């Protein structure tokens, strides 16, 4: 009976699609080619290719990418080890794939249809009959259920959090699998399940899954791992039998026959390798280098070009993170005092050629940001149970990060800092800031791993010393930095949280109370706030874009009020340099540049 019902549903979905009614609005019955978090997908069931990809892109050649850091595992799905880049996507696929011109819409990949109810308390995926792993074995519902169970029990903390919300998963037909989400009250969860990596049940030993390994995972994606030099490089080659090459979502993508990622432990070595042509495309993050260092012969000769790509995503939160698990940073007044000692104007002018903009929100650069916007009635309603969670100037939209005179010796910020320190029980004795009751000096360590981080930290430390703070910079290699970060073993460090136009479950992983004690989560600050948890819940249960924006802005206000980071800065555009042998489409996605849509010029 279940199989017959499923077939009837699929027939209904096909009829709706054919009539033009199959595109999802708030909700429509039946199976669909896509699912949007809010509203309906931009591309109908008959779409031919993504708007940002060129379906005529030539196939062939090799792309070499340079990565700063190292790796000691090819398994990106567990907390152990430093995984190599791009295993997910290149080798391992999910049920659905993102459309990168929309905030959060997923289109068919391993699954060719998705069906959910109005409450999104269940979701059913029907697998594409052509879907195969690289060894030729069919992808079936048992692989999907196996992946869910394995990642729920042994995966990274975010997987465990998300997939634990699923009550049950079961095969309902030869190609269909249904997830029961009853009680989750999480409208994003069907999409999160749609992005779940699907692993080959017959090729994985669950007892060894959490071990670091250089043995490639078997996947269903467009590439397979062809060579590994531990810590130095990973090579991928095209799977000539890739089952999904004709899918609409893939048209114009995956154009290289081979892709290699070379790893560099040092930023200068990384840049010099690009100048020599040892890798093809570089994302620049240093405005000083972008402004002055691209003067080498290949650029003058036109063999290298610099390009600036606009992107419509929130700019994320790049900040110096207070580990509030440390007693020294438990008092919010202390954190705010230190925020007042960061001289962005001096640093931006002297280090960054005034190219950066100051971060003033966890969702800067889009309508989700609360910066400069008074809270509306819906936000105030959400925040009413937490009257002390948001400070008045953040509630009315007048707050902005402290602005200095740019001299490097700003007295206004120093006075504000001393007033806050005094309120928190600290006083200046001679040239040292000490706790008045215990006499304990105010001292902490700032952990860094790159030269850029170290340079910023040293500049900040100079200003902290003016306030009598004994701040020390400790530089460690990438492996030690990652391990200490995972274990929350730091006082302060720099970190960047990326954001999307449809933030959701990952916010619990970033700021949720449960994540504060879960090693491997990204709640590096140790936020434990009922207000934060409630705003995340409101985001996840929002049924309209208006309610979603209100909940996200309310979350932004609570996080800003907590002074959990010293907000840093962001570039207004993506700075990309490439050797001209690599070409790209004329249209840029909402997410900016996408290397999977680029191609090698010699392949024409």
PLM feature spans:
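Surface-exposed binding/hinge segments that line
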Residues: 126, 160-204, 220-229, 374-386
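Extracellular/periplasmic solute-recognition and catalytic clefts
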Residues: 168-170, 226-237, 262-326, 333-337, ...
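Aromatic-rich, solvent-exposed beta-strand/loop patch
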Residues: 108-112, 134, 139, 180-199, ...
